């Protein structure tokens, strides 16, 4: 298995992973999103590939904090193909994200996860990897007037 930055030929596999995560999208939409993300140095899209097939993805955003000095990393996306779960792939992706944050001078890694029943396994994974539930997130769709 290879942990590496995303490349153009990963598009179809990434689209499939996003669909598996429950986000309805197309290759064309994902191509536009990835182009924007990849052009911003604060975003890092890392994949796990086995035999040139992307089986996992982690999206990391580096940001500055108001509540402490330095930067932090926010995991904005994490998915491992259901056929490849419980094989250490998610942990390796998390480890790479952690390394990027440390290399950038940060010391905190955060994430949000839905509180739906189907997310219980993900929450257990996060807790087993040292994360602790500390807050409740809120979301609101907005549009211009």
Model-predicted regions and their roles:
Residues 1-14:
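A short beta-loop-alpha structural element at the N-terminal edge
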Residues 15-28, 66:
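Helix-loop element at the rim of GNAT/NAT acetyltransferase active sites that forms part
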Residues 25-45:
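Active-site rim helix/loop that mediates acceptor-substrate recognition in acyltransferases
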Residues 47, 53-62, 74, 79:
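Conserved beta-strand in the GNAT
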Residues 48, 86-94:
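Glycine-rich acyl-CoA binding loop
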Residues 110-121, 141:
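Conserved beta-strand-loop-alpha-helix junction that forms the acyl-donor binding cleft
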């Amino acid at each position: 298995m290879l942990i590496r930055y995303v490349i153009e030929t990963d598009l179809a596999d990434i689209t499939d992973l996003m669909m598996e995560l429950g986000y309805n999208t197309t290759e064309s939409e994902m191509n536009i999103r990835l182009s924007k993300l990849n052009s911003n140095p604060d975003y890092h899209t890392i994949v796990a590939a086995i035999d040139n097939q992307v089986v996992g993805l982690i999206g990391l955003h580096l940001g500055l904090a108001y509540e402490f000095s330095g930067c932090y990393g926010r995991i904005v996306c994490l998915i491992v193909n259901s056929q490849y779960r419980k094989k250490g792939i998610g942990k390796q992706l998390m480890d790479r994200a952690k390394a990027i944050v440390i290399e950038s001078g940060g010391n905190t890694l955060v994430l949000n996860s839905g509180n739906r029943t189907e997310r219980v396994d993900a929450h257990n994974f996060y807790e087993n990897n040292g994360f602790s539930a500390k807050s409740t997130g809120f979301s609101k769709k907005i549009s211009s007037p």
